[in-house]
């Protein structure tokens, strides 16, 4: 009798195990079906990563690199060469913001759109010269003041959504990736980075005309009490405002534009600028407002004074190695004579409308 009970118990156990095994197999099938439904969605997402488009700056995407350049009618050849040199040496997402006047916009657009530069991204910004009323002194017999010279003072209002920009004069050629200049470190509390005039690159050579254009005394009249009261030593190294990187967030916070306007207005009534000032009349207020409050640009990213004479102030090897060349001064590379015109001219694109043409000595 006991053996029968044991046999029954064993049979029951076997049946239980068979049922359990069947249920486990069923559950396994269900799980497999569920995995087969959801699996491809998961793994497809992973497998697609290597084929996803690269959106890094080297492919023209990513963070916008805002480059601001003035567009003046009689100097548009310079603007075109600057844009061409930048766009040809970078794959970054560069957008050109061209500050100009209403009567020049059509000419700029037709030139850009009618050449290989139709590929570049650009926006035309209108500068209203009326903001300068009462802020610019006009001396008798002096050359008329060009309003566009002061457009750089108003970058936050011209580009209200921008946080960081590069400003370049139109007599500049860039020979390397502009993103390197854009990535110039700007210290906390500084609204801009400039290139000092006393750096080892530029201070070796004299500047044509005027006083010492490497120090504040070359820009400000130290006979005036208001200038002396600033406590700025006359031999303090100056900087060149033709190339700079601006932190517009900090610029707005410090209200730099209003500070610049204040010194412009004071110059109108008190004549605070140096009488021997040669060149950029926008420099004095910038030098005052940014005194000891700016970061430094790598000197190779602003090799300047190429327009101060027609001679070769730098060796061809050095000019070739420079990241950025600046023909500031009287002798522009699109003019009759200048230094290293062949370097500039390789980036120049002829005007499809024929309104702008190069002036060359051999053309006489």
Curated annotation (Swiss-Prot):
One of its GO terms (molecular function) is UDP-glycosyltransferase activity. Its main location: membrane. Belongs to the glycosyltransferase 8 family. The chain crosses the membrane at residues 6-26. The keyword Glycosyltransferase applies. This is Glycosyltransferase 8 domain-containing protein 1. PANTHER family: GLYCOSYLTRANSFERASE 8 DOMAIN-CONTAINING PROTEIN, GLYCOSYLTRANSFERASE 8 DOMAIN-CONTAINING PROTEIN 1. Coiled coil: none annotated. It is an enzyme of class 2 (transferase). Keywords: Glycoprotein, Glycosyltransferase, Membrane, Signal-anchor, Transferase, Transmembrane, Transmembrane helix. Residues 27-364 are lumenal. Residues 1-5 are cytoplasmic. It is found in: Membrane. Its EC number is 2.4.1.-. It is a single-pass type II membrane protein. The gene is glt8d1. Glycans are attached at residues 102, 247, 255. InterPro entries: Glyco_trans_8 (IPR002495), Glycosyltrans_8_dom-fam (IPR050748), Nucleotide-diphossugar_trans (IPR029044). GO terms for cellular component: Golgi apparatus; membrane.
